[in-house]
């Protein structure tokens, strides 16, 4: 039996400790053999000073804080002296206040109570009892002494395992008039001597008590919610809480408290919650899994338990059908994010421990959250196999999602999972933490607008996949959000193959309208829900994007999103029970002629796709149908770079000064022609035909030196928003769009089918891969014109410049005669004799090539500034323009301290797209960017090599 100290109990006096020692109390200072700390009440005679911070006199001269004001009459007639409003009133039902000791000068540097409060208190003549009067632990004090000793030892273990500046304190239950309350007074805690304000915050926490059986957040507080729900709760920053959710908010702001984690503590059987461990930090915290793991191991060492961290062996999913579905989902996420510049898209999948997939027999992935509320029931966890991050700044939010799960009705994704359809919210930051557990991270990473849709795949039957898209925070206008939402739906529709809406409603049925739920968080913790229809231009070539609009439908109110029935409102406004119906899906046929396509050649492919109402991937597929494998304006830049390099090489040769003028090149030198269609070129009058070339070649690559139309200057494409860095979670293969401009030999050779009809029909499944363009075309007016004598034997150039222009290797192949010395006569370039054409491109002598190779020009020996991003790190260095890919990877690996074979590198090209550097030719093209653009820095993106989707098993990964 845990007996109280006789002398202390008899005299009511305790030995006076120093205040500094108490502020920095450690577990080593605890008397484990002493009495239960709340079994006695320390008093002094009226002539002595108060000796302990936990002592509060019961005299009227020093009234007790409202914290301790408990009525013996069941909670009637309470008045308190707090500065809060109606939200902080003591519940008339519970009669238990959970407010701070706001006016006690020993603890707080705040001002004295207002005159109005003193008047009210005086008017009621209410005498507060002693704070510890009648506060005793439950009946089994023997058990409590053992538990307290174990908790003390567990905190000692935790202190040894962490080096962070953290306050760890225990909240234990006590009883008052049959009520269970939580207090940290007299309980063990650990605190670094350099607490940075945490010691004062510890003293503030001593003045708080929280109810564990109240319905009010004010009375429950963070420890009360965790104790009552037996679930952990954590936040990156307590300042994202409201004062109702976190009653110590003012003190947290004052003492710079940020990250907080509260974990329930269970007895060895795991059935009963016996307390709460609270970890408090002065810095923001995103990843709490390591701290949870340390606390759990410390508790396990003393035969106690907490929320289990999922460190068991990773569940493998050997299910080819599911991997096929995830591969298709990844393609949809990729295209949508790239097309509409969304910062993040991810996939949530329902997970139930021990359940089996409907098809294939593989085990479903266990929930990655350390919140144990999902045990035995369905919740949603993010999958690391189908997510796409465009903005590298939101990786922290993505990582936080891995530590959380969502139940039905929580957040936008939870609502979409609940109704089996789609859900949209304009501001997810208005939710409280119970409505959306990730709301604090959304505030932290400035994510506001979210859209989610629940899909099923024919590969996996009834398994649901909830796709969650976050819209750019810069788009705040409702109409702009609606337009973007319609465009997202169009893009998704065009790339669906096996996917369908889980509710059975097909895209585009009922006159191109889709019904979905719009939710809005209300101040009273309710959710306002309404069903609206969006009209989207699924036949996008005939409709304008501005036709996308929302059609209001009758409002559906929801106050309990988790338990409400699943109803779907039809377009007619009649709410019916959802019935899953299998409907035959058809492909929308779209037609674009080559004449229409040519009108957009001067601009970028993205601008053309937007103007025509399609996504860039569909635009690429249309181009391939016409035999156009590379968008013209993209190739113009590479052609110009190649001509510039050609000019430098020629000028570096002795004896050619004034013999060749490359500064007067005109657009007419390099026309865009088509060898199999009669489409008229740009700016030509109606009915005119392009001149026929002698020796007509059916190859798509043609050069002409005689007649060709002029092409207006194209507007350069604007770069994406600042700091956007793109990366994928899987290897870019197996049905995902590939990067442009990769090394030789990795292009997809598609059969070119002659298309005699200038109007074509697109149908069937969308193309998964888009090879680098190889179509030659007009060069902008900023290009150069070669003299006719140089172009006398233009057949030698045919196909070379366009196929892979821009790399030094191809430039040497393109113009071998550029490497010659003074042994060559000037008449080789300028002779008017017809025979000169035969000798113009004769292979140079080996000695001449050797001389040039040994004496590179100064431009070839220049250095280039590289700025590379890897996760949260950015490195900057310089390399020689003649470096190879292995030298680049060695430099990156040396600075990032990673292995050279564990990552891939991409560069930001002229079209602001991330292109994979797969070989030396890619690197040389990358290093030429500063010469052709305004920037002086080459930007690289380093990302880890991830598992290929083609593998047989999926790994969930460990936290």
UniProtKB/Swiss-Prot annotation:
Residues 9-18, 673-687, 694-703, 735-745 have a biased composition (Polar residues). It is found in: Nucleus. Its main location: nucleus. Residues 863-945 form the PB1 domain. One of its GO terms (cellular component) is nucleus. It comes from the Eukaryota. GO terms for molecular function: core promoter sequence-specific DNA binding; DNA-binding transcription factor activity; transcription cis-regulatory region binding. Expressed in roots, stems, leaves, flowers and siliques. Detected in root hairs, emerging secondary roots, vascular tissues, leaf parenchyma cells and stomata. Transcription factor involved in regulation of nitrate assimilation and in transduction of the nitrate signal. This is Protein NLP7. The gene is NLP7.
């Amino acid at each position: 039996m845990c007996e109280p100290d006789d002398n202390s109990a008899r005299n009511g006096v305790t030995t006076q400790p120093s205040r500094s020692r108490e502020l920095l109390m450690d577990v080593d200072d605890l008397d484990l053999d002493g009495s239960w700390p709340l079994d006695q009440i320390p008093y002094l005679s009226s002539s002595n000073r108060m000796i302990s911070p936990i002592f509060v006199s019961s005299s009227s001269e020093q009234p007790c804080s409202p914290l301790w004001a408990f009525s013996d009459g069941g909670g009637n007639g309470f008045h308190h002296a707090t500065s809060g409003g109606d939200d902080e009133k003591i519940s008339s039902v519970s009669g238990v206040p959970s407010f701070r000791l706001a006016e006690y000068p020993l603890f707080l540097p705040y001002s004295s109570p207002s005159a109005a409060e003193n008047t009210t208190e005086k008017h009621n003549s209410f005498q507060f009892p002693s704070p510890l009067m009648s506060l005793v632990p439950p009946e089994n004090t023997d058990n409590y002494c053992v538990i307290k000793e174990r908790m003390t030892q567990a905190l000692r273990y935790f202190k040894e395992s962490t080096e962070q500046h953290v306050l760890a304190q225990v909240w234990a239950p006590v009883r008052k008039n049959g009520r269970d309350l939580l207090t940290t007074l007299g309980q063990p805690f650990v605190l670094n001597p350099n607490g940075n304000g945490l010691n004062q915050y510890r003293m503030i926490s001593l003045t708080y008590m929280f109810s564990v059986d109240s319905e009010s957040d004010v009375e429950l507080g963070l420890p009360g919610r965790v104790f009552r729900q037996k679930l952990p709760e954590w936040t990156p920053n307590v300042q994202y809480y409201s004062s109702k959710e976190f009653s110590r908010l003012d003190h947290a702001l004052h003492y710079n408290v940020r990250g907080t984690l509260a974990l329930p503590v269970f007895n060895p059987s795991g059935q009963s919650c016996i307390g709460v461990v609270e970890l408090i930090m002065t810095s923001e915290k995103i990843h709490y899994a390591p701290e949870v793991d340390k606390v759990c191991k410390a508790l396990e060492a003393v035969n106690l338990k907490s929320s289990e961290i999922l460190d068991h062996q990773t569940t493998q999913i050997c299910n080819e059908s599911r991997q096929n579905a995830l591969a298709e989902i990844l393609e949809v996420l990729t295209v949508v994010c790239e097309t509409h510049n969304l910062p993040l898209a991810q996939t949530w999948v329902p997970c139930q421990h021990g359940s089996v997939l409907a098809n294939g027999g593989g085990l479903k992935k266990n929930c990655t959250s350390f919140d144990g509320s999902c045990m035995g029931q369905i919740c949603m966890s993010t999958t690391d196999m189908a997510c796409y991050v465009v903005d590298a700044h939101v990786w922290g939010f993505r990582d936080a999602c891995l530590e959380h799960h969502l139940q039905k009705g929580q957040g936008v994704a939870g609502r979409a999972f609940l109704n089996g359809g789609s859900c949209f919210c304009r501001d997810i930051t208005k939710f409280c933490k119970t409505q959306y557990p990730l709301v604090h991270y959304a505030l932290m990473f400035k994510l506001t607008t979210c859209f989610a849709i629940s899909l099923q795949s024919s590969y996996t039957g009834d398994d649901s996949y909830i796709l969650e898209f976050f819209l750019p925070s810069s788009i705040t206008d409702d109409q702009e959000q609606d337009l973007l939402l319609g465009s997202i739906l169009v893009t998704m529709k065009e790339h669906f193959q096996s996917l369908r809406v889980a509710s059975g409603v097909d895209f585009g049925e009922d006159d191109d309208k889709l019904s979905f739920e719009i939710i809005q968080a209300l101040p009273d913790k309710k959710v306002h829900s309404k069903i609206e229809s969006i009209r989207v231009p699924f036949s996008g070539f005939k409709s304008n994007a501005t036709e996308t609009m929302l059609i209001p439908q009758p409002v559906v109110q929801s106050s309990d999103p988790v338990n409400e029935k699943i109803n779907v409102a039809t377009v007619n406004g009649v709410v019916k029970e959802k019935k899953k119906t299998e409907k035959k899906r058809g492909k929308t046929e779209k037609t674009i002629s080559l004449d229409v396509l040519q009108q957009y050649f001067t601009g970028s492919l993205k601008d053309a796709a937007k103007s025509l109402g399609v996504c860039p991937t569909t635009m690429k597929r249309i181009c391939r149908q016409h035999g156009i494998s590379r968008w013209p304006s993209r190739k113009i830049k590479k052609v110009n770079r190649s001509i510039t390099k050609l000019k430098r090489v020629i000028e570096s040769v002795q004896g050619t000064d004034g013999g060749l003028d490359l500064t007067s090149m005109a657009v007419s030198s390099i026309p865009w022609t088509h060898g199999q269609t009669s489409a008229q070129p740009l700016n030509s009058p109606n009915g005119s035909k392009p001149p026929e070339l002698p020796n007509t070649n059916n190859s798509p690559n043609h050069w002409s030196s005689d007649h060709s139309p002029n092409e207006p200057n194209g507007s350069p494409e604007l770069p994406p928003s600042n700091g956007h860095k793109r990366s994928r979670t899987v290897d870019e293969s197996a049905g995902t769009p590939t990067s442009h401009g990769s090394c030789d030999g990795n292009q997809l050779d598609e059969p070119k089918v002659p298309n005699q009809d200038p109007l074509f029909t697109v149908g069937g499944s969308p193309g998964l891969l888009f090879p680098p363009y190889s179509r030659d075309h007009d060069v902008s007016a900023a290009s150069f014109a070669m003299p006719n004598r140089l172009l006398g034997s233009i057949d030698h150039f045919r196909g070379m410049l366009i196929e892979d222009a821009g790399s030094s290797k191809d430039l040497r192949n393109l113009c071998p005669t550029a490497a010659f010395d003074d042994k060559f006569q000037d008449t080789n370039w300028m002779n008017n004799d017809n025979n000169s054409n035969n000798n113009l491109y004769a292979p140079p002598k080996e000695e001449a090539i050797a001389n040039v190779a040994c004496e590179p020009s100064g431009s070839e020996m220049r250095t280039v500034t590289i700025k590379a991003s890897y996760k949260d790190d950015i490195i900057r260095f310089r390399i020689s323009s003649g470096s190879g890919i292995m030298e680049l990877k060695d430099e990156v690996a040396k600075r990032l301290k990673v292995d050279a074979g564990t990552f891939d590198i991409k560069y930001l090209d002229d079209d602001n797209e991330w292109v994979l550097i797969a070989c030396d030719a890619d690197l040389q093209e990358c290093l030429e960017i500063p010469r052709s653009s305004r920037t002086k820095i080459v930007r690289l993106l380093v990302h880890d090599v991830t598992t290929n989707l083609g593998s047989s098993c999926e790994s969930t990964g460990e936290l």
